[in-house]
Every structure is written in structure tokens, then in C-alpha cells.
Amino acid sequence: MILATTSSTFASLEEMVTVLSIDGGGIKGIIPGTILEFLEGQLQKMDNNADARLADYFDVIGGTSTGGLLTAMITTPNENNRPFAAANEIVPFYFEHGPHIFNSSTGQFFGPKYDGKYLMQVLQEKLGETRVHQALTEVAISSFDIKTNKPVIFTKSNLAKSPELDAKMYDICYSTAAAPTYFPPHYFATNTINGDKYKFNLVDGAVATVADPALLSVSVATRRAQEDPAFASIRSLNYKKMLLLSLGTGTTSEFDKTHTAEETAKWGALQWMLVIQQMTEAASSYMTDYYLSTVFQDLHSQNNYLRVQENALTGTTTKADDASEANMELLAQVGENLLKKPVSKDNPETYEEALKRFAKLLSDRKKLRANKASY
């Protein structure tokens, strides 16, 4: 549920800072891909512009793991300085390349499940030599450096102070997707402000931000507000001036029914290892959503935040690396069905209706800013 567009909101709408956040989740990126296709389609209809792209409407787009890949796809420029991928090309990308990225025949018993070679190959082909500074809007893509034991956040706004972060987009995308046990960590080097070599040893961004990067994306926006006049309205954490759309890759309603305290009391390290990551990711994603919902609500701006998430995945759709055609078809259907579901138990508005409202705000805001710039 989000702000209704009335004459009283237009004055403040122009000042709104818009943020899009996309979760990690491997092949489950098909779900937010479906949502993004719907949203971009609505924007194109409202603005009567088939070339309208999400990067034209969001001030910050952030993602981790597969969400980082989607972020790059919709913000990396092509030869015409437009996003190289439209939102309706995201799901076909997974269908074409997913089976090769998650090809079990390339894995080893001792070592990562997949060798990552095809993933790197397709990233290099699609993203070329493009670097962070060329992104068409502010980005926030996370990774984790296993040499320094610190998160690494790739954003445009950090480049003046830390030019070593101006890495190639394909290096960043592989790094944010390099989930331990699934893909090998990624090493690459850039140059510091003094010309020295700066070395990165990176793994999946979910290690740094878990699977939901919404807080990271908001933090990048508020930090940029200290220096960029375009973000001035959200200084002092004024979330009343922020529109946040957060897209999940789905969780399972069966998870909390799977185990009991009596059962797990007998578990050892191996049994816990099989489920602890799923537990941690589910809990962290819930807490991120809970925190943001609470903050926006306390500021009487709860309608400025929309979390789109499927909480009832079952069977193969819960797996981040099942890229069989049958499962990808199921994931695409999950995304389509999600649009028809209510936002929450307390809010009967469907996600489709909420996203249309969100699109209207984005469209109106863009027009207001364009009109102001023309004077």
C-alpha cells in the first residue's frame, strides 16, 4: 500500500527520493524479474514511451547476489547510453543462461558445486568493460572480502574518496553472486587514488547484507543526501521523503513447520549446517522488513514503503539453483500469481494494484521534475 496521488501530495512528490531494492536468491531472481517487467510496462503505458526504463525513475537501485545482477542489467548502459536490458528481458535471460550457470556437471565433490566459468563468460559478454561510474543511476551492490573480513559496497557516490571501487561491472556481478559452496570466490584488482594496485577477494554479497539489501540501499541514499542536492529532502533520515520498493525472491511457509525443538535438540553440527543458512536468511529478511515497516510507520509514512514477497514457496521453487525448465516455469508463474495476491492480511489491495499506484507516483514525479527543469 502506498501514497495516493492527490493535489496535496504533488508539492512534496517532486522532492521524493526513490529507491529500488532487489533480494538475492539465485534462479529465484525470476520472481522479482516478473515484478520488474510489470512495473516497467506500467511506466511505459503511463508515459506513452516504449523506451521508458526503470533507471529513469529510481534514484538508487540496489541488489545483492542475483539482485545485484538484476541491478546491473537495468542500470548498465549500452552504446546508446540506455540500459542494455529492458525489464522484459530479465526472465528470458534466466531461461537462456540459468541451465548453463547452474550446470551440475561442472561441479566437484570437493570444492564449489559450480565452477562459475559460464557465469563469468556471460557477464563479460553482456556487461563488457563498463565500470561503476558509468551506471545510469546510483547503484548499491554488495559483496564481502574474505581477505579483509569486511563488506564491500560498490556505489557511484563512493568513487571520489575510493576510486578503487570503480570496478568493472562483470567483476562486481560475479562477486556478489559468488555464494560460498556454490561458486568459487573472485579475485581481481583495481587502482587506488595513488595508482597502487588494490586487491579484492570477494564472495556473495549475502554474506555482508544477507539476502535483503533494502537497508543497504536506504543507507546509500541517506548517505548521498549529505553531498548531493538532489537527495537533500531525506537529510536527517527524513523517510517521509522516500519511496522504497523492495522485491523479494520468495520464502517458504513450510520452513517453520519442518522442525521441532524436541527434534533439533538431538542434532549435531552436520544437521544444523544443512538448515542454518536458510534459517538465518529467513530471519534476517523478516527483521529487515520489520525494521523498515516500523520506521516508516512511526513517521506516519508507512505508505511510502512496499515490500513485494511470496511467502509460500514449496517444492523445487525453494531452491536457489534448480534451473530446470520445469522449475523456471513454476517460478515465472509464482511471480505472475503474486501480482494477484493481497499485500498483507490487513491490506486487501493486491500487489498489482499497489504497483500501479507506485508506478503512478514514479511517473508523476518524473514529469514534475522535467517541468521544473524546463523553466
UniProtKB/Swiss-Prot annotation:
Belongs to the patatin family. A motif (DGA/G) lies at residues 204-206. Patatin have a dual role as a somatic storage protein and as an enzyme involved in host resistance. It is an enzyme of class 3 (hydrolase). The keyword Nucleus does not apply. InterPro entries: Acyl_Trfase/lysoPLipase, PNPLA_dom. Residues 1-11 form the signal peptide. It is found in: Vacuole. This is Patatin-1-Kuras 2. Probable lipolytic acyl hydrolase (LAH), an activity which is thought to be involved in the response of tubers to pathogens. A motif (GXGXXG) lies at residues 24-29. The gene is pat1-k2. GO terms for cellular component: vacuole. A motif (GXSXG) lies at residues 63-67.
